[in-house]
Amino acid sequence: ALSRVCELFDSPVIHVGGDECRWEEWEADEALMERMHDQDVTNGADIQRLFLSHCAAVLATFGRRLAGWDEIVGMAGKDLPADALVLGWRENGLGARDARASGRQWVQCDADLLYLNRLAGAIEEEPTGMNGIITPQRISEELPSLLNGERLIGVQAAAWSEFLTTPDLLFYHLFPRLLIVAEVAWHGEAALPWSEITPLVEEEIMTLQSAGIPCRPLT
C-alpha cells in the first residue's frame, strides 16, 4: 500500500502517522501475536516499532522521507531515520519537547494552539467544535514564543473534521485564525503585536467575505 502511495504522489515527504496507537488490540489477537513471535516481537509496542521500520525502508527505496507524529520518537528510538521529519502535536509542550530532543528536523503543530477545529470563543457563543478555546488573540500572543529551537522548519495548523460537518463551518473555524497563524509563522518572534495585526486581518476578512467565504468575527 505504501508503495502505491509513492507511485500516486510525488511528494518528497510521506506522513505515516504513528500516534494514539492502541497496542492492546494487537496484543489481544492470538493469531497475530503468534505470527509476530516468529520475528521476536512480543508486544504491541514492538509491533508498531517493526511497522515504522518497514515504512522507513519502503520509503527509502522510493527516495522518500518519512514523517510522523512526535510519538514516533520514543517508539522508533535509534531506529528512527536520521532524515525523519517529526511533527510535534501533543499538548502541554510534550510534542515539541520530544520533537526537539529527537535531533531531527521538526514542525510545530501544538494542539493547544494550532488545532483550529477547537472553539474560537466561549462555548455558548460558538458553533460546534472541539473543546479547548483558541481565540485569535491567543494565537497572536502565544505562538511566537513557540517558534524557536534547533531544527524547527515550520508550523502546521490543523482542522480535524469530526465536528466540522459543512464547508461553511470549516471556513468559520479556519478564518480569521489561519490568517494569524500564517502571519506569525512567516515572521516568527518578529511578528506584529495583536494591536497592529488586527486592522490587517480585518481587511483580509473583508476580502474573503467578498469572495463568498464565511469568516468568524475577529473579536
Language-model features: where?
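Active-site neighborhood of glycoside hydrolase catalytic domains
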Residues: 1-84, 89-103
